[in-house]
């Protein structure tokens, strides 16, 4: 397996965390579990491999153009074949500039983006498949998303406000400080909840919870600190709080995860 990151055009950096290319050269079966990250993704399947995700009580074949909603619980995936996948990973709030639907309806699902965005995204997929150069593919993505951004000035203005709110939430906030954060940004607590949910598909509390988990996952994967220190550095009240949250997102205790690191989550952790 080969996994590479690429940065988007500068104008897109407040919205797109990175592009990535995933390639596998062997036609072998593969299974893993995806954990919550707080981010949403678009994935263009450019190879012949088949991916399936466990949704609605059974495995379903993923579409050619995947929209990954917020993952709020462990999501099982499996694949077979030779893969070439080009992904777009957005910051937690940023997919909303592309979509007219409420973001929360996509939670814990892999949706067919061509059904949502229509011909424009299908044409982009065709162009990406026709170009074998990664430089050309990145240029196509940059052009497409820059154009979509230019069409949504009002959405972009709200995105900047939501980005500032999310930054406040992740900077050492607790459940009890949401009211103070709302005051800081000159809005009511109710409006803060509405803005965060509309743009991320998550409540402020859930967003903060996933952020802490993601921090702990990265620290565990680095394997440089004891679990007690990781719990503290990630912002948990105590060790039991850390273990409870970690298990709800992975199905494993932190120590069990450390002994069985997930390939997909290792690749996507940054």
Language model features by range: what are they?
Residues 1-163, 169-173, 177-179, 185-189, ...:
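Alpha-helical bundle regulatory/interaction domains
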Residues 186, 207-210, 240:
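Conserved structured core elements
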Residues 222, 226-229, 243:
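Phosphate-/nucleic-acid-contacting segments
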